[in-house]
């Protein structure tokens, strides 16, 4: 006996979306991020770098530490924006968050590739960073649309400052890493501006200070581990 669709196009075993599907989708997304499966939609910025003399071992270690920090930042960005979007009830805001997360995938892939070029690896604590950031994103979204967008804007503002510091600290000879960080900084500025235009409000000073403290903890740990 065979089972066939009717002339109306009805499929008797078509799958209906269940209440746990969004959860399964987020778990799948997390596994893809943490497994290093991300691929960029845009060209690799480092490809445009001029050939330079080889880096010394010390320069490579320092550059790898900084790029590992940047990679952790992109893991956190994926989790943060997915968490914010998951709890957001405003469709336009949710789309803005998901669009930013999609662009950050490029950054994730670029940092991962550069770490490989430098003979290094991502942070061993990435699962912890992801889980914490996703939870933080959900909490930010529960604070309301204006604060949710304000959190996005403040996050990007602090990331811009952090990337500025990396541009000052990276070896001048490491033009490949510098090209990547420069492009990332430009993208973060656009994300911040988008959040502000969409209605993001400034966060209270204690919240901004707590965000900076958490960022310092993450960066100082990820540089080594």
UniProtKB/Swiss-Prot annotation:
GO biological process: ubiquinone biosynthetic process
GO cellular component terms given for this protein: plasma membrane
Cell compartment(s), UniProt: Cell membrane
The keyword Signal is annotated on this UniProt entry: no
Annotated membrane topology: Peripheral membrane protein
Catalytic activity: a 5-methoxy-2-methyl-3-(all-trans-polyprenyl)benzene-1,4-diol + AH2 + O2 = a 3-demethylubiquinol + A + H2O
Cofactors: Fe cation
Residues annotated for Fe cation 1 binding in this entry: 74, 104, 107, 188
Main location: membrane
Biased composition (Basic and acidic residues): 184-195
Region (Disordered): 1-20, 181-203
Molecular functions (GO terms): 3-demethoxyubiquinol 3-hydroxylase activity; metal ion binding
Binding sites annotated in the UniProt record for Fe cation 2: 104, 156, 188, 191
InterPro entries: COQ7_proteobact, Ferritin-like, Ferritin-like_SF, Ubq_synth_Coq7
Pfam family, one: COQ7
Biased composition (Polar residues): 1-11
EC number: 1.14.99.60
Co-factor: note: Binds 2 iron ions per subunit.
Keywords linked to the UniProt accession: Cell membrane, Iron, Membrane, Metal-binding, Monooxygenase, Oxidoreductase, Ubiquinone biosynthesis
Functional note: Catalyzes the hydroxylation of 2-nonaprenyl-3-methyl-6-methoxy-1,4-benzoquinol during ubiquinone biosynthesis.
Family note: Belongs to the COQ7 family.
The protein, known as: 3-demethoxyubiquinol 3-hydroxylase
């Amino acid at each position: 006996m065979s089972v066939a669709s009717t002339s109306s196009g009805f499929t008797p075993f078509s799958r209906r979306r269940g209440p746990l599907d969004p959860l399964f989708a987020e778990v799948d997304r997390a596994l893809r991020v943490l497994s290093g499966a991300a691929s960029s939609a845009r060209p690799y910025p480092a490809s445009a770098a001029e050939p330079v003399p080889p880096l010394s071992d010390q320069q490579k270690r320092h550059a790898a530490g900084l790029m590992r920090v940047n990679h952790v930042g992109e893991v956190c960005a994926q989790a943060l924006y997915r968490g914010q979007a998951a709890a957001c009830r405003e469709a336009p805001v949710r789309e803005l968050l998901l669009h930013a997360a999609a662009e950050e995938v490029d950054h994730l892939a670029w940092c991962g590739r550069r770490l490989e070029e430098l003979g290094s690896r991502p942070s061993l604590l990435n699962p912890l960073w992801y889980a914490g950031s996703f939870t933080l994103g959900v909490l930010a979204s529960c604070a309301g649309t204006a604060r949710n967008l304000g959190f996005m804007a403040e996050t990007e503002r602090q990331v811009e400052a952090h990337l500025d510091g990396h541009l000052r600290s990276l070896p001048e000879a490491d033009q490949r890493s510098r090209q990547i960080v420069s492009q990332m900084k430009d993208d973060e500025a656009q994300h911040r501006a988008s959040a502000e235009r969409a209605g993001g409000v400034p966060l209270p000073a204690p919240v901004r200070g707590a965000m900076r403290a958490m960022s310092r903890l993450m960066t100082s740990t990820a540089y080594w581990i």
